[in-house]
Amino acid sequence: MNYEREIKKRVHNEKWCVTNEQYEYANQIKMVNDISNGSETDITKIAIQEINKKIAGYKHQDKLKKLFDENNFLTFDSVINKMIECELKCRYCLREMNVLYDISREMSQWSVDRVDNNLGHNIGNFHLACLDCNLKRRRRTDEKFLFTKQLNIIKQDTQDTQDIKDI
């Protein structure tokens, strides 16, 4: 039996005229900055549409879980500002994230990660994280997960330690 997941392309991407180059990180950052500056191009229009679609999904989630707070729910501008602030890098693993992606369930896609999962996707209650970290964090606290993701264990060479003792 083959347990490897089949890589599925996103169907609606076929309608886009997006080059492989436009999926690259540097171009995704430029695209976010262009959106922030009000530049309208074919690629920014697609990105705006995709961001709004994802925000609508978070709104739907909050309504289902009875967490929706109309006065505090995140906005398009709050998401764009957060993308610029974090330079489109995951809060936890610092991976470069994608706004546009062509593979379903792309683990490097941006996602909204709630600081307090008992609250909705509200301004002041979210960071941006890659989908991989967002799914792995589950119900752990934001700070504990951040600590485990950015923890660097330094292993000393025991031979160097022995040489120092001999001196």
Regions found by a protein language model. Name each.
Residues 1-19, 66-67, 121, 153, ...:
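Structured catalytic/translocation cores of nucleotide/phosphate-coupled proteins
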Residues 45-92, 118:
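Short, charged surface segments at domain edges that flank catalytic/cofactor-binding sites
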Residues 115-127, 135-167:
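Polybasic, low-complexity binding patches
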